[in-house]
């Protein structure tokens, strides 16, 4: 993705000569598949945004020493990644992960959340994995998306979800 921010690039190396077993691993994000937190967060935000992929930005405005806004930045679209119906299906599945699955540490809060956990193996011999979570809140009308990776930690539900919860809590607490 062409961004003005510097970040590592995602990659998935597959070709017609890729062995079937490796192709199957790639389909679930294992093997030689590499995705950056930035890229995954953009995809997650597109799901939350009814299928529209937005360009990320870090600062929404700049103020002078008197607190007057001297420059504002606005969200802009890359384009549509999926239909609204496809997005709605993914939102429901991601809500189910919180309500019934591996992101249950986000259940029963003063806001709703939706997301997907992951445990990306990086050492086939030991079975070591990176803990992932990507999601948004509130589930029914998203305002904020987060993507967490804790390298070498293990399960996304055990290690990445609690960090996501702290970020969501901070976001909603500052709004009060």
Language model features by range: what are they?
Residues 36-42, 159-166:
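Short amphipathic alpha-helical face segments that pack within enzyme cores
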Residues 143, 155-157, 174:
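Intrinsically disordered, low-complexity acidic/polar segments
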Residues 1-148:
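Beta-lactam-recognizing serine transpeptidase/beta-lactamase-like catalytic domain environment
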Residues 68-71, 163-176:
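Short, gly/Ser/Thr-rich active-site loops of penicillin-recognizing serine hydrolases
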Residues 82, 152-160:
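Short alpha-helix boundary/capping segments
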